[in-house]
Amino acid sequence: EAFPGQST
């Protein structure tokens, strides 16, 4: 799951 600030 992509969360704000995470570039995965």
Swiss-Prot record:
<keyword id="KW-0964">Secreted</keyword>
<dbReference type="GO" id="GO:0090729">
    <property type="term" value="F:toxin activity"/>
</dbReference>
<comment type="function">
    <text>Has a vascular smooth muscle spasmogenic activity.</text>
</comment>
<keyword id="KW-1015">Disulfide bond</keyword>
<dbReference type="GO" id="GO:0005576">
    <property type="term" value="C:extracellular region"/>
</dbReference>
<protein>
    <recommendedName>
        <fullName>U28-ctenitoxin-Pn1a</fullName>
    </recommendedName>
</protein>
<keyword id="KW-0800">Toxin</keyword>
